[in-house]
A protein has these predicted regions:
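Thiol-/selenol-based redox modules, centered on thioredoxin-like
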Residues: 156-157, 161-238
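Short acidic, S/G/P-rich loop/turn micro-motifs used as interaction or catalytic elements
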Residues: 71-76, 105-109, 176
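N-terminal targeting signals for export/organelle localization
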Residues: 1-50
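Short, internal strand/loop/helix patches
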Residues: 115-158
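Structural beta-sheet core signal
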Residues: 67, 99-101, 161
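Conserved helix-turn-beta segment immediately C-terminal to the redox Cys motif
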Residues: 79-101
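Short active-site neighborhood of thiol/selenol oxidoreductases, capturing the structured segment around
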Residues: 56-83
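Thiol-based oxidoreductase modules, predominantly thioredoxin-like and allied folds used
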Residues: 95-109, 125-135
Length: 238
């Protein structure tokens, strides 16, 4: 066998075994991935809220990015644009995905103006504005049980991930590698600041992807949750 044949066979062997080795490396991760933590159960649904959609807009049975734009939604143009470009455009093709923005009754015209600006290049089929009373909006936000609050206009730049069982998802431990190495105190990530591009691009997009992976594994019957729940941390020194 000449040198050229030896080289050729070696290259073919590498091309054959490299993908197989890569798949074998990934196989354990497929079945032992970390799921997105449940932070709050029993988030209130949107019963009684109105919208421009033909059917009622609800959180249950959907993966929802939930936001509160308050009495002046047009003033949240930057927040909305970031959400559209960094989250909506990435996940709009996934089954049951939606972005829902909660607004006070009486803001319908301003909301339509904002949506028209976002719809310059495409229809936002999975983006919904819903309208309710101030008390109903406060009740929805309070049910999230998060540290950040709505302002006097019932608005916040923070957005939230709600799963199909009406649970708030996020991270029980959002420490960086350096913070872990330094043994900094544990802190959660219950919301994502839509003004900060990095927060949406690097954290929220990743967390939504992880949740869709969880749903896919459940459908295939391969789901084995290794995530920690909020109750698991009670009574620990972590």
């Amino acid at each position: 066998m000449n040198t050229k044949q030896i080289k050729r066979n070696a290259i073919l062997g590498i091309l054959f075994f490299l993908p197989v080795t890569f798949l074998l490396f990934l196989y354990p991760a497929k079945h032992n991935y970390n799921t997105l933590d449940v932070l709050t159960n029993g988030v209130l649904d949107l019963n009684g809220f109105s919208s421009d959609a033909d059917a009622p807009i609800l959180l249950e049975d959907h993966l929802t990015v939930l936001g509160f734009f308050g009495m002046h939604p047009i003033g949240k143009h930057t927040t909305a644009s970031n959400l559209k470009e960094l989250v909506y455009d990435k996940f709009k093709g996934f089954k049951k995905f939606q972005i829902v923005i909660v607004l006070p009754e009486g803001t319908e015209e301003e909301a339509r103006t904002l949506k028209a600006e976002l719809m310059k290049y495409e229809e936002l089929k999975f983006w919904h504005f819903v309208y309710g009373s101030p008390n109903s909006i406060k009740a929805i936000h309070q049910s999230l049980n998060v540290p950040d609050a709505l302002d006097a206009n019932l608005a916040t730049d923070h957005v939230y991930i709600i799963d199909n069982e009406l649970s708030l998802r996020g991270r029980l431990d959002d420490r960086t590698d350096n913070e872990l190495a330094s043994k900094k105190p544990v802190y959660q990530k219950a919301s994502y600041d839509a003004i900060k591009v990095a927060d949406l691009k690097n954290k929220m997009s990743e967390d939504v992807r992880v949740l869709f992976t969880e749903y896919r594994q459940k459908r295939k019957g391969n789901f084995d949750s290794t995530s920690r729940r909020a109750n698991d941390l009670k009574g620990t020194d972590e």
